């Protein structure tokens, strides 16, 4: 049985924050430089544990800096302005031992109510089915794939809160 909890970063122990960071780094899609600080600035952190208290999944809602948002939207050649999407869904990582169980879908579904009235963006590798569940939650691909700088391309997904006023 899996259990999940959502916390403000300020309510997490140092060990919980370190475990979150470790799993995100193991996921391999994030620059680890400054990650601990970015985790502490997130608006919500979600943790999923297996029955043996092993951390098997994480996710977050973030309010990234305008410079980062603007770069993502420009790189993706987004068709809408970055300042309309202030919340980022990210750091959705599931351990290899628990992949294929739709745990990412659960993580996203549990986080979205904390940003139900907000437009949300997310990025993921273009070559993965990471956001295959995106349409379940109203995310739509926007713009074009762009280089990540780490040897793979990224794509931008957007969720417009106005389209789903009663979804949460």
Regions inferred by a protein language model and the residue ranges of each:
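Conserved acetyl-CoA-binding loop-helix of GNAT-fold acetyltransferases
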Residues: 90-94, 99-113, 136
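Short hydrophobic/aromatic beta-strand element in the GNAT-like acyltransferase core
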Residues: 43-48, 58, 91, 154-156
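Conserved acyl-donor/pantetheine-binding loop and adjacent beta-alpha core of acyl/acetyltransferases
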Residues: 54-91, 148-152
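Short amphipathic alpha-helix that is part of the acyltransferase structural core
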Residues: 1-37, 45-56
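C-terminal "cap" of GNAT-fold acetyltransferases
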Residues: 127, 147-168
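Conserved active-site alpha-helix within GNAT-family acetyltransferase domains
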Residues: 126-151
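Conserved GNAT acetyl-CoA-binding A-motif
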Residues: 113-126
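Short secondary-structure capping micro-motifs at structural edges
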Residues: 33-36, 75-78, 106
């Amino acid at each position: 049985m899996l259990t999940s909890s959502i916390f403000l970063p300020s309510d997490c122990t140092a060990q919980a924050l370190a475990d979150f960071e470790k799993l995100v780094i193991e996921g391999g899609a994030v620059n680890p430089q400054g990650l601990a600080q970015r985790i502490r600035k997130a608006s919500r952190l979600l943790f999923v544990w297996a029955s043996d208290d092993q951390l098997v999944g994480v996710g977050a809602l973030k309010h990234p800096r305008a410079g980062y948002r603007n770069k993502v939207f420009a790189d993706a050649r987004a068709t809408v302005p970055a300042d309309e999407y202030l919340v980022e869904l990210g750091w959705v990582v599931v351990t290899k031992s628990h992949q294929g169980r739709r745990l990412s879908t659960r993580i996203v579904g549990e986080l979205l109510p904390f940003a139900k009235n907000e437009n949300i963006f997310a990025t993921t590798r273009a070559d993965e089915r990471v956001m295959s569940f995106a349409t379940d939650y109203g995310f739509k691909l926007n713009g074009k794939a762009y280089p990540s700088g780490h040897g793979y391309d990224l794509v931008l997904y957007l969720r417009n809160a106005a389209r789903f006023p009663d979804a949460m």
